[in-house]
């Protein structure tokens, strides 16, 4: 079963960390963050990451659950996430900026690292509901 290591973008921002820090997840592991802001979870084959987070009792952001907004956006830092059809992200955002939507995204690697709650990034703001 794939494992997703996750970090809340708001926590990254509050701590003054940079999305491109090589040791971003090590810093998060050492920071004593609560389980909703940083941790790992198993995601069943074909299960959406947002659903897995909710099954853990986490209140991750979402709105449409259909890939039509950017409320649940995350940035893939390691591994790969397959998404169902979506209409909101540009090819550049998916291919170069590694943006994925957790409401329609499932891990496509045994280990995936994401920064969720990425809706706060400037280039996604105009697609948040």
Curated annotation (Swiss-Prot):
CDD domains xrefs: fer2
Alphabetical list of InterPro entries matching this protein: 2Fe-2S_ferredoxin-like_sf, 2Fe-2S_ferredoxin-type, 2Fe2S_fd_BS, 2Fe2S_Ferredoxin, Beta-grasp_dom_sf
Positions of [2Fe-2S] cluster binding: 64, 69, 72, 103
Domain 2Fe-2S ferredoxin-type: 29-120
PROSITE patterns the record matches: 2FE2S_FER_1 (PS00197), 2FE2S_FER_2 (PS51085)
Record note on cofactor: Binds 1 [2Fe-2S] cluster.
Highest taxon of the lineage: Archaea
GO molecular-function terms, A-Z: 2 iron, 2 sulfur cluster binding; metal ion binding
Modified residues (N6-acetyllysine): 119
SUPFAM superfamilies named among the record's database cross-references: 2Fe-2S ferredoxin-like
Record key words, sorted: 2Fe-2S, Acetylation, Electron transport, Iron, Iron-sulfur, Metal-binding, Transport
Pfam families for this protein: Fer2
Cofactors, names only: [2Fe-2S] cluster
Coiled coil: none
Family label: Belongs to the 2Fe2S plant-type ferredoxin family.
Known role: Ferredoxins are iron-sulfur proteins that transfer electrons in a wide variety of metabolic reactions.
UniProt protein name: Ferredoxin
Record organism: Halobacterium salinarum (strain ATCC 700922 / JCM 11081 / NRC-1)
């Amino acid at each position: 079963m794939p494992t997703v290591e996750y970090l809340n973008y708001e926590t990254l921002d509050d701590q003054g960390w940079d999305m491109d820090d090589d040791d971003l997840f090590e810093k998060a592991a050492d920071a004593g963050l609560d389980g909703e802001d940083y941790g790992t979870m198993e995601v069943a084959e074909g299960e959406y990451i947002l659903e897995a987070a909710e099954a853990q009792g986490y209140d991750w952001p979402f709105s449409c659950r259909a890939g039509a907004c950017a409320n649940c956006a995350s940035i893939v830092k390691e591994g790969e996430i397959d998404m169902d059809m979506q209409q909101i992200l540009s090819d550049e955002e998916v291919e170069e900026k590694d943006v994925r939507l957790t409401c329609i995204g499932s891990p496509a690697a045994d280990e995936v690292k994401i920064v969720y709650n990425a809706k706060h990034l400037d280039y996604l703001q105009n697609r948040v509901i």
